[in-house]
């Protein structure tokens, strides 16, 4: 059937289209043009210039797609490659899955370069470079680094995760670099120790274990379990120190608190500044 089709292996079939070749045993090309199956049990349903080159690989359609991993599948689209074991590219264009059991749903120029059980749902130029059980739901130019386990980027752009169990919800250019760190959104925020959290804002840093920044601009929570609610240019640098809001406030001893205001400093242990400007509480429990 069809025109210039070839079935060259046992129980193979090229049943429609033109210039198709079923070269693997028990392989099938149903239609389309210039499609080729080379592995045992390979299937190409249609489309053009598609290749199923490993055992039980499948290409459903589209143009210039390649399923080269054992049990791999490409649903459609253009120039997609599924080369990992049981890997899948559902659609889109120029997507590549090299890792085992990896899945790319669609989008453009997304890559899972190695690792196991990783997913990129869609988006543009997202990359998983070798983690395991990690997910990029969408967005643009997001990256999960190699050796990472079970981390997630939900969306946004230019995010980087390089630690296990880390999460970035969205925003732009956020970095979660330690295990169990979380950035919900915002721009250019960095969560760089275990269990750190940044909810949003711009250029905020949580750099000690269990430190939290709620939002604001250029705030730094660098003490263990320290907290900054918001404001600008505030620093909570010791364990359990708290700055609720304001600008240019400093809580620089354990359990020190600044509730708000401008350029206030709580430098004594258990000290507190309620608000105002240029106030200093330097004594213990002052």
Label every PLM stretch briefly:
Residues 1-286:
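Periodic small-residue-enriched repeat registers in elongated scaffold domains
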